[in-house]
Amino acid sequence: MPLPPSTLNQKSNRVYSVARVYKNACEERPQEYWDYEQGVTIDWGKISNYEIINKIGRGKYSEVFSGRCIVNNQKCVIKVLKPVKMKKIYRELKILTNLTGGPNVVGLYDIVQDADSKIPALIFEEIKNVDFRTLYPTFKLPDIQYYFTQLLIALDYCHSMGIMHRDVKPQNVMIDPTERKLRLIDWGLAEFYHPGVDYNVRVASRYHKGPELLVNLNQYDYSLDLWSVGCMLAAIVFKKEPFFKGSSNPDQLVKIATVLGTKELLGYLGKYGLHLPSEYDNIMRDFTKKSWTHFITSETKLAVPEVVDLIDNLLRYDHQERLTAKEAMDHKFFKTKFE
C-alpha cells in the first residue's frame, strides 16, 4: 500500500487508535483519489466569467465575496485563497472535487485563477444564510431534529468518502431557513483519513476542538467532527453559546474538564498511553464530573431527556465512544415526535 501524504501527517510506528467506521474508505479507492502530494490536475474555468459584488467575509486562508456569473446571471460565492503552500490548496481542491454534489455539501461550480498573481479562486453556490446567533435562538425541537439530521447526513457522506472535515462549527454550517436548506462549507482544513497516521492537532476552532486535539492525540479520526456537533447541540439546548468557552487552548480543556471531570480525562489519556502536556501543570484541577441536569434551568425548554442523552453520547472524552454520524441519526431523539 502506498504511504499516505507525508508532509502534513506522519505514518506512525505505533498504531493505537483506528476509526470505528470507514477506516479503509481511502485505501479502497485508487491512489489518485486521495494523493494530493503529486499535485492535482485542475480544469481551470474562465475568471472573466465572474464578477465580484462585495466582500462578505475573511478567514486565515481566504477572502470571501458575493459574486455573479455574467454568463447566466447566477449569484455565487467567490473564495479567493490567500498565498499558502500549494499542497494545502491541492488538498482543498481534491477534497471539494471528490465531495461536490454530495448531500448538503456546498456545491463547487468552478475553479479559476488570476492571470497575473496565479492565485486560485473557488466559485461556490450561494446560500441565503441567516447568522446562527439570530437563527438558533428561534429553534424549536423539530427544527433541531431537521437541521441536525441534515448536518449528520453531510458528515456521514464525507466520512464514507474517507474525509474528516476538522472544522465543524456554526460559522461553517450555512442555513437558509426559508428553503430549509443546510450546507456544510469551508473544507480548507479537511483531510483524508488513513488508519495509523499521526495527524496535525492544530485544526478546528477553539470552542469546537475535541479533547484529542488538546492532549496531542495525533491518531484521531472522523469522530472529531462528532464532538464539534455535540458542542453545537449543547450550545443550542442549554442556551450557552459557546458551550465550552476557553480563553486559550489549554484553558479550553480545563473548561471541558469542569463538565466531564478530571478523573475521566486521566482515564482517557491512560487508555491511549498519553500524558497530560506540561502546559496543564498549573491550571488543571481535580474537577468532579457534572450531571447534565446541572445545565437545565427554567429557560432551557429544549432540554428534553432524548436530546440530553444525544449530547451525552457525543460529548465523550474517548473519541471511540462517541456516536458516529450514522449512529447519531439513529438516536431516539430523531425518532421522537415533538410539537
Curated annotation (Swiss-Prot):
One annotated Gene Ontology cellular component of this protein: UTP-C complex
Residues binding ATP: 56-64, 79
Organism, scientific name: Saccharomyces cerevisiae (strain ATCC 204508 / S288c) (Baker's yeast)
InterPro entries per record: CK2_alpha, Kinase-like_dom_sf, Prot_kinase_dom, Protein_kinase_ATP_BS, Ser/Thr_kinase_AS
Role according to the record: Catalytic subunit of a constitutively active serine/threonine-protein kinase complex that phosphorylates a large number of substrates containing acidic residues C-terminal to the phosphorylated serine or threonine. Phosphorylates YTA7 during S-phase to promote transcription of histones.
GO annotation terms (biological process): DNA damage response; donor selection; maturation of SSU-rRNA; nucleolar large rRNA transcription by RNA polymerase I; regulation of cell cycle; regulation of ribosomal protein gene transcription by RNA polymerase II; regulation of transcription by RNA polymerase I; regulation of transcription by RNA polymerase III
Record keyword Repeat present: no
Miscellaneous section: Present with 4540 molecules/cell in log phase SD medium.
Protein name: Casein kinase II subunit alpha'
